[in-house]
Amino acid sequence: MGINRAEQSLVINAPPAACFDAIVDFESYPDWQDAVISAEVLDHYDHGLGRRVQLRVDAKFREVVYTLHYQYERPERLWWDFVEGDGVEHIDGEYVFEPLDGGRRTRATYRLGVDPGVPVPGFIFRKLNDGVMRRSIKDTKAEVERRAGS
């Protein structure tokens, strides 16, 4: 089917470091990321951040389980590549955190590439993917602002 790519951005009322800290707290995802059923850090880098993370996600058209390999440029960016999965052929993406207003706020940009591995009409896949991404970035905004007391 090929990789479908999408992007969502919004402004979060917290500094980039607060955004970064929330998004790398993988094992808390089920508490605040609506689509995430479970998240497990399989191994860590020496600096403590998760290297490989297994996620179980309600992707609306089916439940999928996959492992991603993460890399970091703290606190501006993190990105991931597909390792293996059941219910999906490929996932890659990134979060970029751009400081605004002297670092008091952040423009968060979420980019995602997905190959579901099964034939899904493009317009349906785009609608599902757009909804999942929009929900995910809004969940991120709510959690970061909750943690920051904004």
What is each model feature region?
Residues 1-48, 150:
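Hydrophobic ligand-binding cavity/cleft-lining segments
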Residues 5, 11, 79, 96, ...:
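Conserved beta-strand segments that form the floor/walls of ligand-binding pockets within enzyme
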Residues 7-11, 65-69, 92-94:
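Well-ordered beta-strand positions in beta-sheet-rich domains
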Residues 11-15, 56-60, 71-73, 83, ...:
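Solvent-exposed residues in well-ordered beta-strands and their adjoining turns
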Residues 23-26, 36, 53-55, 70, ...:
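Conserved short hydrophobic patches within well-ordered secondary structure
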Residues 30, 40-88, 107, 135-150:
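Glycine-rich portal/gate segments that line the openings of hydrophobic small-molecule binding cavities
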Residues 82-135:
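Beta-strand/loop substructures that line and gate deep hydrophobic ligand-binding cavities in soluble
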